[in-house]
């Protein structure tokens, strides 16, 4: 195939189909929409969840669960996340916010034992699980309530 042997496609030359422009166009009168009914009208759309008048699935199934409002204010930190910041000796809520480890809206933090900590740190004003407390104290750290 060469550039000089290329020709326009038959479909390229064909003009755009203009519906509802007289009987002679082939798409006159109803314009491909059929006769009457909701789908023939302008703006006549049926939502995806419509089941033909039958009670829809989202109303047949019972409600369950809820979104807790407390979730916005509580967070948990793992021990290995604290171990990543080697220059921190003293840890409290405001310091965790400064180093972007928690969101600014968080008011309560709990430290959980996931991983190990190998250096002494001082934790104040944060709740700590039993396992995390043992791990911190065995590394030479202190947990203040």
Swiss-Prot record:
HAMAP family: Ribosomal_uL15. Signal peptide: none annotated. Part of the 50S ribosomal subunit. Gene3D superfamilies: 3.100.10.10. Belongs to the universal ribosomal protein uL15 family. This is Large ribosomal subunit protein uL15. It comes from Buchnera aphidicola subsp. Cinara cedri (strain Cc). Keywords: Ribonucleoprotein, Ribosomal protein, RNA-binding, rRNA-binding. Binds to the 23S rRNA. Residues 23-51 are annotated as: Disordered. It holds the Pfam family Ribosomal_L27A. The keyword Hydrolase does not apply. GO terms for biological process: translation. GO terms for cellular component: cytosolic large ribosomal subunit.
């Amino acid at each position: 195939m060469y550039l000089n042997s290329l020709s326009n496609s038959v479909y390229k030359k064909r003009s755009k189909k203009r519906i509802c422009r007289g009987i002679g166009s082939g798409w006159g009168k109803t314009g491909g929409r059929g006769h009457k009914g909701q789908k023939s009208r302008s703006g006549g759309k049926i939502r995806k969840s419509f089941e033909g008048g039958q009670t829809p699935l989202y109303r047949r199934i019972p409600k369950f669960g809820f979104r807790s409002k407390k979730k916005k204010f509580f967070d948990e930190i793992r021990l290995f996340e604290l171990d990543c910041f080697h220059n921190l000796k003293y840890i409290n809520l405001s310091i965790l916010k400064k180093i972007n480890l928690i969101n600014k809206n968080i008011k309560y933090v709990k430290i959980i034992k996931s991983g190990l900590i190998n250096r002494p740190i001082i934790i104040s004003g944060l709740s700590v699980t039993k396992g995390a407390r043992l791990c911190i104290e065995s590394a030479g750290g202190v947990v203040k309530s």
